[in-house]
């Protein structure tokens, strides 16, 4: 007899666990706040290390399929200074041990490997409490609840399960990251595409930096990093349709005055 497992969160961790349990004949149900697998973008490239992530995929029986998703050339690395001068370069020779893959593609692989109905979409957890004797109750935003003999929290930074084990809460660490995308970069943004190369780019300075990854289809996915007080970024909501994104972009770009144009274009020419 096995105890059904309840997993909160259909991210990579929760789905990998559900798949490994399925391989071993242990039923699990995954509850996810998002309405569907395509409710939002799923982030950029992930490097899956040989000593942990790939081991989990082997246990899940999905390693061969994972290899088919690998972005060839994605382990290449370029480091530039603020003037665009190459400081360090490491090509992808095909012998690396941390291949890059799109997070969304890996998530879909995991979803497709699970029995229909394993993931319950649109179930946002509002509370979790112990019932004693190893059982727990999970309450959802729609007022419904489930009880379970084994509860796993895989629901990220703002986990509703973690408080059962720890009083720790996320705290502002002193830096913010702003994401941008450039599409069809080789044709439309050739200077930036050349700067990034075939894999990852790092252009860092004290208190700030520009990091970018090349994704399949000529997409450049950039993270602009700034250190500073939380108040600097509070009140800016780039997802709000009423936000003047041009003004916000200009405000952030001002912090990179004097940087090489092929680097700042990763921010100022961003299409999202």
Features from the language model and the residues they span:
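Short phosphate-binding/catalytic loops that engage adenosine nucleotides
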Residues: 26, 62, 261
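Short beta-strand micro-motifs enriched in acidic
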Residues: 130-133, 213-217
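FAD/FMN-dependent oxidoreductases across multiple families
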Residues: 194, 198, 205-208, 214-216, ...
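Conserved N-terminal helical subregion
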Residues: 2-5, 20-22, 47-185, 229-239, ...
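A structural signal for isolated positions on well-ordered beta-strands in alpha/beta enzyme cores
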Residues: 6, 29, 221-223
């Amino acid at each position: 007899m096995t105890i059904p497992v309840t997993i909160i969160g259909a991210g990579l961790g929760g789905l990998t666990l559900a798949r490994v349990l399925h391989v071993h004949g242990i039923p699990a149900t995954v509850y996810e706040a998002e309405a569907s697998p395509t409710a939002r973008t799923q982030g950029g490239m992930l490097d899956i290390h040989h000593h942990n992530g790939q081991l989990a995929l082997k246990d899940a029986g999905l390693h061969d399929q994972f290899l088919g998703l690998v972005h060839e050339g994605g382990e290449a690395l370029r480091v530039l200074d603020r003037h665009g001068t190459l400081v360090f370069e490491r090509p992808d020779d095909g012998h690396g041990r941390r291949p890059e893959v799109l997070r969304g593609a890996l998530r879909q692989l995991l979803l497709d490997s699970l029995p229909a109905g394993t993931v319950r979409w649109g179930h946002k957890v509002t509370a979790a409490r112990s019932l004693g004797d190893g059982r727990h109750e999970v309450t959802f935003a729609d007022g419904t609840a489930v009880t379970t003999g084994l509860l796993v929290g895989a629901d990220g930074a703002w986990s509703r399960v973690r408080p059962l084990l720890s009083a720790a809460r996320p705290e502002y660490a002193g830096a913010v990251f702003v994401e941008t995308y450039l599409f069809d970069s080789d044709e439309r943004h050739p200077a930036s595409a050349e700067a990034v190369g075939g894999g990852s780019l790092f252009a860092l300075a004290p208190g700030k930096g520009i990091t970018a990854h090349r994704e399949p289809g000529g997409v450049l996915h950039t993270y602009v990093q700034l250190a500073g007080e939380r108040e600097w970024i509070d009140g800016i909501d780039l997802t709000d349709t009423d936000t003047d994104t041009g003004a916000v972009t200009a405000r952030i770009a001002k912090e990179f005055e004097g940087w090489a144009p092929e680097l700042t274009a990763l921010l100022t020419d961003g299409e999202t």
